[in-house]
């Protein structure tokens, strides 16, 4: 696992899914694969859960494949647990920024791990949260 002080990027589940599931949007799939290949990321237990359930449902991953993926996430990336602190901060973020319940936990997890950039396709490209976390669409023109 990477040292958290050396990792500045948090990657939301949608980008992982473009990389793992062959999509009709080849540009997004290629960009996601390149981004993942070139970086170590901060992710959360929630991201792992979302990726796994979608791979089971959409790509028919079996349990061996899911177990291998979980192990690789923990070996190759910094994984943030969902703690009471993360959940309480998520509530504050929901109130202030009007994110969904799940998105606020992602944002809170990224802030908790001191990420500078949160890559997410669906959370407002360019938005700066708490003056220190910038949301970037990995498929947008600025990516």
Residue ranges and their predicted role:
Residues 1-4, 108-143:
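Acidic, PIN/NYN-like endoribonuclease modules and their adjacent C-terminal/linker elements
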Residues 46, 71-95:
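Acidic catalytic patch
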